[in-house]
């Protein structure tokens, strides 16, 4: 039990390195835009840089799968994690440096360092996930819990820092309070978290946890298995011993049809398009129109829900494709509500600030919970059976494909055609 919990914590810390770099920059945007010459155009430039970095997984996939070149996974993971540490440390000292690019003053050190972080974050989907195939299946949940922490840690730090606290004068002009600690200190704290992730990875490799795939997790005493049978869906409450017997009766995913595999991969892409591309692009428009606190509660509580929902797979395991399809539909409808709220900005839904606040926060939490749970459940199903490392590679690839597609769709809508409009801070 102690060994399991120790390994679980190490995997979660390792998983937190997946997107903490990019998320840390995003959570500082309110301070960065006030200081840097790009102003509120800065998010558009940074979004473009992150999307260019998404070419990293494509290049890796071509080398690994197309050319069939054998790439040593462990050294490569270590190199990328060290690169993330270097870029995170560089942000502490050079985030506000500028220089001339094509005759205009640009924050090119920030561009370069974010590009390095985004490369690591993007390629983690196709590099870190296959590495997790060597662990016991329960530790895949721990990895996704860590992915949730990669958003939760920067958002909590941002709340403590007080990046967007302000008061309004009689002329409806916002005046921002100074942050409790500087941008450099914020990036330094995230640097230490990234170093902790590197240390966790090295300890995992040193103790050989990835080779001990027979390590059994303590199954919850009462877990719910929802399984797709030949013609019915059964729900059974089982204890530890009967849980393994029931699991063994499930057809091995290696014999699953191509349609089942295609469903899992395509829904993985769809869920991640909503989670990492669509919601993140419009959430500020859907919440800031009601208040700054509404935005902070929506973002922070969503980041709390995400790792908790990832852990839910320990207790509720759904293998029925119709039920998973229904949950995916529910997540899509919730995402549609967020888009609708964003499209209404700067107006309130039902002309009510209270109703809008409740709906915007609730929809953000429901979407975050469903997206996180479905992402873990799809990965767990893809991991089952033979060729689990290859299946998790394609799971990671479709996570990145979905995220890129969602961002690519929303970028012109938000930044080119400007279909969404921000509300004044004071009204």
Curated annotation (Swiss-Prot):
The chain crosses the membrane at residues 3-23, 43-63, 74-94, 112-132, 140-160, 185-205, 262-282, 298-318, 323-343, 354-374, 392-412. Residues 24-42, 95-111, 161-184, 283-297, 344-353, 413-427 are extracellular. Residues 1-2, 64-73, 133-139, 206-261, 319-322, 375-391 are cytoplasmic. Induction: Down-regulated by high levels of riboflavin. It catalyses: riboflavin(in) = riboflavin(out). GO terms for biological process: embryo development ending in birth or egg hatching; riboflavin transport. Its main location: membrane. It is found in: Cell membrane. Pfam families: SLC52_ribofla_tr. Expressed in intestine. It is a multi-pass membrane protein. GO terms for molecular function: riboflavin transmembrane transporter activity. GO terms for cellular component: plasma membrane. Disruption phenotype: RNAi-mediated knockdown causes a severe reduction in the number of laid eggs; the few laid eggs fail to hatch. Optimum pH is 5. InterPro entries: Riboflavin_transptr. Keywords: Cell membrane, Membrane, Transmembrane, Transmembrane helix, Transport. Activity is strongly inhibited by riboflavin analogs, such as lumiflavin and lumichrome. Belongs to the riboflavin transporter family. Riboflavin transporter. Riboflavin transport is Na(+)-independent but pH-sensitive. This is Riboflavin transporter rft-1. It comes from Caenorhabditis elegans.
């Amino acid at each position: 039990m102690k060994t399991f919990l120790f390994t679980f914590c190490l995997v979660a810390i390792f998983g937190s390195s997946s997107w903490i770099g990019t998320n840390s920059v995003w959570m500082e945007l309110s301070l960065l835009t006030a200081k840097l010459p790009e102003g509120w155009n800065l998010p558009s430039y940074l979004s473009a840089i992150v999307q260019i970095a998404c070419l990293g997984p494509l290049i890796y996939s071509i080398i690994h799968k197309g050319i069939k070149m054998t790439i040593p996974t462990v050294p490569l993971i270590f190199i990328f994690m060290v690169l993330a540490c270097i870029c995170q440390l560089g942000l502490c000292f050079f985030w506000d440096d500028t220089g001339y690019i094509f005759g205009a003053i640009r924050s090119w050190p920030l561009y370069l360092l974010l590009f390095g972080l985004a490369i690591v974050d993007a390629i983690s989907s196709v590099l870190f996930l296959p590495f997790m195939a060597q662990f016991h299946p329960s530790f895949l949940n721990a990895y996704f819990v860590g992915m949730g922490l990669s958003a939760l840690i920067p958002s909590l730090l941002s709340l403590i820092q007080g990046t967007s606290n302000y008061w309004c004068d009689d002329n409806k002009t916002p005046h921002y309070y100074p942050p409790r600690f500087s941008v450099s200190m914020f990036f330094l704290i995230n640097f230490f978290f990234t170093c902790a992730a590197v240390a966790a990875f090295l300890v995992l490799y040193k103790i050989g946890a990835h080779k001990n795939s027979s390590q059994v997790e303590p199954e919850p005493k009462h877990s719910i298995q929802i399984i797709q049978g030949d013609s019915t869906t059964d729900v059974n409450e089982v204890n530890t011993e009967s849980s393994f017997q029931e699991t063994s009766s499930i057809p091995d995913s290696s014999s699953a049809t191509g349609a089942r595999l295609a469903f899992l991969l395509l829904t993985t892409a769809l869920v991640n398009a909503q989670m990492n591309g669509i919601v993140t692009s419009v959430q500020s428009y859907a919440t800031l129109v009601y208040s700054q606190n509404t935005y902070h509660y929506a973002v922070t509580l969503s980041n709390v829900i995400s790792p908790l929902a990832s852990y839910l797979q320990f207790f509720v395991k759904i293998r029925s494709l119709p039920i998973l399809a229904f949950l995916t539909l529910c997540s899509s409808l919730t995402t549609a509500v967020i888009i609708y709220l964003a499209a209404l900005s700067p107006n309130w839904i039902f002309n009510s600030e209270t109703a809008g606040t409740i709906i915007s926060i609730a929809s953000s939490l429901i979407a975050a919970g469903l997206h996180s749970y479905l992402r873990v459940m799809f990965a767990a199903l893809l991991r089952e059976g033979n060729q689990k490392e290859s299946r998790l590679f394609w799971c990671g690839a479709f996570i990145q494909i979905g995220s890129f597609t969602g961002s690519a769709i929303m970028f012109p809508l938000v930044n080119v055609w400007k279909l969404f409009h921000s509300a004044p801070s004071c009204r």
